[in-house]
Amino acid sequence: MGKSFANFMCKKDFHPASKSNIKKVWMAEQKISYDKKKQEELMQQYLKEQESYDNRLLMGDERVKNGLNFMYEAPPGAKKENKEKEETEGETEYKFEWQKGAPREKYAKDDMNIRDQPFGIQVRNVRCIKCHKWGHVNTDRECPLFGLSGINASSVPTDGSGPSMHPSELIAEMRNSGFALKRNVLGRNLTANDPSQEYVASEGEEDPEVEFLKSLTTKQKQKLLRKLDRLEKKKKKKDRKKKKFQKSRSKHKKHKSSSSSSSSSSSSSSTETSESSSESESNNKEKKIQRKKRKKNKCSGHNNSDSEEKDKSKKRKLHEELSSSHHNREKAKEKPRFLKHESSREDSKWSHSDSDKKSRTHKHSPEKRGSERKEGSSRSHGREERSRRSRSRSPGSYKQRETRKRAQRNPGEEQSRRNDSRSHGTDLYRGEKMYREHPGGTHTKVTQRE
């Protein structure tokens, strides 16, 4: 589907793009170029002959003068044909074996670069590195040296015509042909001509230790084995002791670190727990020291340990007594402060009441005092109740109710209420500036606020 017209026409015999016509054109071009080369060679030969003839005439050769030189010289094309035959006889190397007896056209006889494609034969234009033959690679099983290293391949007998299989020469040929080995194979500072690359056979030299062991008898060998076993056991014991000592050290360090971390956490949580933990740690340390001393001096150290314990118990008791006395002193200091504060509050109350009484006695006569006291007490009770109710309500509603009640009252009561409010204001003003002296010599400022 969809093939072009050119693809259809190139299959015709008369079309110039057909394969047969292209081949014919190429063959004709090759013949023309071959003929041109022959003519050029003949012209060069003729020029050389003319030069040699002229030189002989100058030298004075008699044969040239007589004109008999042509009798002793071969025809112009005979020398070249003989040389080509000698070269072809000497050259036995072919890329492939089937090329030795295969017929070839004249223009392709001398040119080895032309690749032949015979019918029914697989042609691989590849050369082996090991055997240097065409048609396979060193990894193919066709190669006669397959599976052999360079050193082993060099030892294999050959006809002598092939190249040597030494690794240094193989590496050089690989480089010339464009291949190269990795550095991991040769090494960084290794070269192909390095003597370490050559195979060196062992000369049968033995170590002095092996000779000494061979010279010993069976009994001496048994003794040596026993000694070696003992030394190995001693080494193992030493290693075990070292490991145990290291483990005990690591455990001791871990215990210390855990105790220090626990003490730091307790101190951060509360000061009381830190004190108790520090005391317990100190007690533990002291007990450890005492145990060590007891182990060292079991017989002589009993009395000393008892005296030390007594001294420590005395020190603890003194410490507890000092802490309790300090606590009692702080309580005793706090009590008078509280009493002074309460007494100052009571004095302020008494001074306020006295100032109210004095202001009322100065302003009013003794006849009106009884009536005013009764009215004041009743009014104070009413005010307290109103203030309690007004706290829960809004201030706007409270003011409106007071104005309505004032309008309902009598004018005589309003005048008496105004007089009471004036007298009360003066009493407040005086009460704010009054001072009272206490027996201790301290002055307290009395203030009254409603």
UniProtKB/Swiss-Prot annotation:
Extent of Low complexity compositional bias: 258-281
Q: Which residue positions does Phosphoserine occur at?
A: 202
Lineage, top-rank taxon, reads: Eukaryota
Which InterPro entries does the record associate with it? CIR1, CIR_N_dom
Q: Which organism is it from?
A: Homo sapiens
| Name of protein | Corepressor interacting with RBPJ 1
List localization entries: Nucleus speckle; Cytoplasm, Cytoskeleton, Microtubule organizing center, Centrosome
> One Pfam family, short name please?
Cir_N
Its job:
May modulate splice site selection during alternative splicing of pre-mRNAs. Regulates transcription and acts as corepressor for RBPJ. Recruits RBPJ to the Sin3-histone deacetylase complex (HDAC). Required for RBPJ-mediated repression of transcription.
